[in-house]
Amino acid sequence: VILRGQIFDIERFRPTESGETASPLSPEELDEYTYLVAGSVGEFWTRICCQHILGYTSKSLEDLLPVARRFGQALQLVNILRDRRSDADIGRVYIPDQRFYAEMEHVGELLTAGDEYTASVVPRMLRAACLLPLDLARRTLALVAEHPLGERVKVPRYIVWFALIRAMIFKEEIQIDLIREKQ
């Protein structure tokens, strides 16, 4: 599946002899692309963890797979939004400017799947491993929102370290907060 996503990317954005760039992805193509390169990864690791880690989740595999898919897609969409100018410079326009705000809203909705997924992970260290990319994605998205013209943004290294420590130390408290918010 991941290879299909990479092939899709290469073929879709192949340079033409005339030097024209490909049109931006449609919302449907973007959904397919983010599934192929990231949503499928969420499904894959969820299957592996459910099969090999006793008590991995409080949900059934059937219920968790669509959540894993959306969580993976959300993380990829954050990267696409973050890199949209540098990607455009090399002829890859995943999201046209006129859809920027709609996709910012959409990725915010998709990230709630990360909350749901993380809340369902039982082993504390694995829960922390889910919290870290979720936290960094939200921080990155906030920076992207502050720079809507597409300037390259990056979460500072000290914030990354802070997020790592926060995920490791406060994993139970964060989970309790997430569960309370859902009720």
Which ranges hold each PLM region?
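Catalytic cores of Mg2+-dependent Asp-rich isoprenoid enzymes
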Residues: V1-A74, L81-Q183
